[in-house]
Amino acid sequence: MNEKKVECVLTGTVVSSNRDKTITVLIERKVRHPIYKKYIKRSTKVHAHDDKNECICGDLVRVVEAKPFSKTKHWSLLEVVERLVSVD
């Protein structure tokens, strides 16, 4: 029974990176209203493990579902898709 597990990979924006090795990622999706057929934005915040502390607020990142790191942290940073360009 060699069953391959399907990895859940989501893309979102980092909204907090204040804690050590932990980032908060805001994941937005659009769902269709069942009666009015209009698309509505829905969002979810997840905590992800950032082992190298490489993310800052505003980065576009890809996270993958992983084994639980703590009570609320069940995601791991896969890659930084786009860095936030800071204007000084």
From Swiss-Prot:
GO cellular component annotations of the record: cytosolic small ribosomal subunit
Gene Ontology process terms (BP): translation
InterPro entries: NA-bd_OB-fold, Ribosomal_uS17, Ribosomal_uS17_bact/chlr
Entries under SUPFAM superfamilies matching the protein: Nucleic acid-binding proteins (SSF50249)
This protein's UniProt keywords: Ribonucleoprotein, Ribosomal protein, RNA-binding, rRNA-binding
Xref: HAMAP family: Ribosomal_uS17_B
Quaternary state and interactors: Part of the 30S ribosomal subunit.
Function in brief: One of the primary rRNA binding proteins, it binds specifically to the 5'-end of 16S ribosomal RNA.
Protein name: Small ribosomal subunit protein uS17
Species for this entry: Vesicomyosocius okutanii subsp. Calyptogena okutanii (strain HA)
